């Protein structure tokens, strides 16, 4: 782990550190109080730093949300790790390679024709990406936080990656926060594969949500199906929440506006 820089966020105590694990960039923030919870976030470019975010100066404001919610609950704030995707001019589809569930497509799931030129099964790298997170990044930054107190969060492709990670690594974290999961990549077949791969209910918690504007406007039929399948599997009550946010879109500003709710869903348990 090589440190690149440190920077501060208004209203957030301490520094955010930017480090490198091989070619993978990571931003992370540790609260001044000893953290007992850990949040792992995809698309780390958008978590803390408005100068690196997809939409200029639009971030998740994740540390601010964590501080608000933890103070209201009377607990120490969680540590937050933001893992950058690898998209660049040289690797224009790097984000998709990192986040799209590799095993499903390697085993024959057919991608929607609109994405066939982008998603090539043998080029997907999500398994290697997740291995780096769990075997290198987390042990180096937050080695003493229990998996039972660890959550993962992502939006769009990051939402898919979060659910995939829970199915593939259920012993590594116990709460999945999937905002605006991008089901249209493969439609109901992707929904079925994802839900059937999740661990048996009883120990894990799952949050899913979407808006009604932009890309999110197409998600409702798939999410309704996902909700039905998940409840059929036995996820219910405090273990599963699915929300629709009217007039909410597909961008960091929209997700940040309601982030306190999934944050509380996780931390209040």
Positions of the model-derived regions?
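Non-catalytic cap/lid and distal C-terminal segments of serine-dependent acyl enzymes
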Residues: 1-269
